[in-house]
């Protein structure tokens, strides 16, 4: 059995203590409540303070939870609300398209897959929740880069690797792709990330009309394309799914 790291256990206990009871606690209160020496408690508090998880009141010297915890908590709630709102619609999209469906959000310099619906057949498939995809070559990544200014900056700053001979890497060409994405309301990846694989994605917006994620389908090129072009009924299905999730998030009509 793996051994727990004592300092992390103590830090977690400290955060739980600050989250309950009085709004602010002094060093002595924290140390005595957790059975720690003052020096040990102070060292942990100082580290948590440096990371933004704990704040110290200048006047009283007492400690309280910091803004970084609020930011992390808000991110957690946003992602889980997005996934919850998308469950029914992504299942419908998988059934109507016959392809696998991915729901992605911006995470650092890539796309984090937060929901994955298998292609509705008997083929062997691997669950990809928690996987990362590049911003510059995938349909999900292009959508986020086109609509989210933060994702756009991350995509431009990242190392845009050429996965195939179709991958767009040059900044000017990439910007042109994003212009096209915004103009038509969806993004495509036809063998730009994986040989023989194509994907279509569209943006999801929240009640503030801010981009919060992207939804898309992925499958073999011969199934998603016809005579060298994306099948329009699949593009429409993806866009309809994105609009439906956006409406459920309070975005209104799109």
Swiss-Prot record:
Q: Which domain of life is it from?
A: Bacteria
Please state the span of the N-terminal signal peptide per the UniProt entry: none
Which UniProt key words apply to this protein?
A: Activator, DNA-binding, Glycerol metabolism, Transcription, Transcription regulation
Q: Which residues bind DNA?
A: 27-46
What Pfam families does UniProt report for this protein, alphabetically? Answer: HTH_IclR, IclR_C
One GO MF term attached to the UniProt entry: DNA-binding transcription factor activity
* Covalent S-S links between cysteines: none
Residues of the HTH iclR-type domain: 5-67
InterPro entries associated with the record = GAF-like_dom_sf, HTH_MetabolicPath_Reg, Tscrpt_reg_IclR_C, Tscrpt_reg_IclR_N, WH-like_DNA-bd_sf, WH_DNA-bd_sf
Alphabetical list of SMART domains matching this protein: HTH_ICLR
Alphabetically, which GO biological process terms does the record hold?
glycerol metabolic process; negative regulation of DNA-templated transcription
Residues in domain IclR-ED? 82-251
What is this protein's function?
Answer: May be an activator protein for the gylABX operon.
Name of the featured protein: Glycerol operon regulatory protein
Q: Which gene encodes it?
A: gylR
């Amino acid at each position: 059995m793996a051994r727990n790291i004592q300092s992390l256990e103590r830090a977690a206990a400290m955060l739980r203590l600050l989250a309950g009871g009085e709004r602010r606690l002094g060093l002595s209160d924290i140390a005595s409540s957790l059975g720690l020496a003052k020096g040990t408690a102070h060292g942990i508090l100082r580290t948590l303070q440096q990371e933004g998880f704990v704040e110290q009141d200048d006047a009283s010297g007492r400690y309280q939870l910091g803004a970084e915890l609020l930011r992390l908590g808000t991110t957690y709630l946003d992602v889980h609300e997005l996934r919850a709102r998308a469950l029914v619609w992504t299942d419908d999209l998988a059934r109507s398209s016959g392809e696998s469906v991915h729901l992605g959000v911006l995470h650092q310099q890539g796309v984090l897959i937060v929901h994955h619906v298998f292609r509705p057949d008997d083929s062997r498939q691997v669950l990809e929740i928690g996987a990362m995809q590049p911003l510059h070559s995938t349909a999900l990544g292009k959508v986020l880069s086109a609509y989210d200014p933060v994702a756009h900056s991350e995509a431009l700053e990242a190392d845009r690797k050429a996965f195939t001979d179709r991958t767009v890497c040059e900044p000017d060409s990439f910007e042109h792709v994003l212009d096209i994405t915004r103009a038509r309301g969806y993004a495509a990846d036809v063998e730009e990330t994986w040989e023989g694989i194509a994907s279509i994605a569209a943006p999801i917006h929240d009640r503030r009309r801010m981009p919060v994620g992207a939804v898309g389908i992925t499958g073999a090129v011969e199934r998603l394309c016809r005579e060298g072009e994306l099948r329009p009924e699949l593009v429409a299905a993806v866009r309809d799914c994105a609009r439906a999730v956006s409406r459920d998030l309070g975005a209104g009509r799109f």
